[in-house]
Amino acid sequence: MKAFYGILIIFILISMLDLSQQVFINAKCRGSPECLPKCKEAIGKAAGKCMNGKCKCYP
């Protein structure tokens, strides 16, 4: 049972870290297709989407 609690605590601590590789760029958008060329220009890869009016790119 102690091992379970230890693993649970480790899992909680690891989940609190921000491990995402997403990059918000300061480009306004109304749809995800508008972000693709902007992400290609900013990070070199055309992978992104529009969230809350801003482009979010994924390397």
Curated annotation (Swiss-Prot):
Belongs to the short scorpion toxin superfamily. Potassium channel inhibitor family. Alpha-KTx 04 subfamily. Keywords: Disulfide bond, Ion channel impairing toxin, Neurotoxin, Potassium channel impairing toxin, Secreted, Signal, Toxin, Voltage-gated potassium channel impairing toxin. Expressed by the venom gland. It comes from Tityus stigmurus. The record marks Y58 as: Aromatic residue of the functional dyad. This is Potassium channel toxin alpha-KTx 4.7. Potently blocks Kv1.1/KCNA1 (85%), Kv1.2/KCNA2 (91%), Kv1.3/KCNA3 (89%), Kv1.6/KCNA6 (94%), and Shaker (97%). Its main location: secreted. One of its GO terms (molecular function) is potassium channel regulator activity.
